[in-house]
Amino acid sequence: MSGRSVRAETRSRAKDDIKRVMAAIEKVRKWEKKWVTVGDTSLRIYKWVPVAEPKVDDIDLKVTDENSGLLRRPKPSAKKTKNKKKTKDDKCGSELTTPENSSSPGMMDMQDDCSNQSSIADASPVKQENSSNCSPAPDQNVSTQPEGSEVKLEEGHSNASEQQDSEVSSGQNSHSSTESSLNSSEKADTQTSGDKDSTMEASKNSQDSDDGTPPCKKAKGDSSQPNNDGI
């Protein structure tokens, strides 16, 4: 009998301890941090606040096994799920009506700053997109400029080659013209010299015919005259 009484006492103590622990856990679960206004003033404090929701006696839902002493949680019923949904809706409504969303100078300034920063952040990608959209045009211009420069270089090379060819051909033509002029001048000189020689011979023959003496005799006579003069 003594052993059974001891076991019963330990079971009751364990049950009490478990109840205390669960109560402490439930208290922690039903508390949350929120911004709360102090009275009628605009002062707000961020502190722990109990969750405003309908109380459900979890102790009634818990079933203890007398043999094992363990706690068993039954499956949630439809009513409990409906209550949970209601509590979630209430939480959402309370968050909407909490002092966080209430209008005040400090919070309005903070919200304005946040909205300005978000607008700047939203505008910056648009600017980047615009710059990226505008940037291909210079790339196209740059790509067309080298093509135009290459065409110009090719045209310049072709013009230079044509000029060189024309200069070479003009040089050859001038050289051939100078050679032809030199040849013609040489021919003219030879012709004039031949004409002069022929005229000189003709004049000598005419003089000889006028004197009536052959040229050899005349040469002898000319040579004898200086001798006579010397005598």
UniProtKB/Swiss-Prot annotation:
Residues 72-86 have a biased composition (Basic residues). It holds the Pfam family BCL_N. Residues 63-231 are annotated as: Disordered. Residues 174-185 have a biased composition (Low complexity). Residues 186-199 have a biased composition (Basic and acidic residues). Residues 95-105, 113-147, 158-173, 222-231 have a biased composition (Polar residues). InterPro entries: BCL7 (IPR006804). Belongs to the BCL7 family. This is B-cell CLL/lymphoma 7 protein family member A. It comes from Xenopus laevis. The gene is bcl7a.
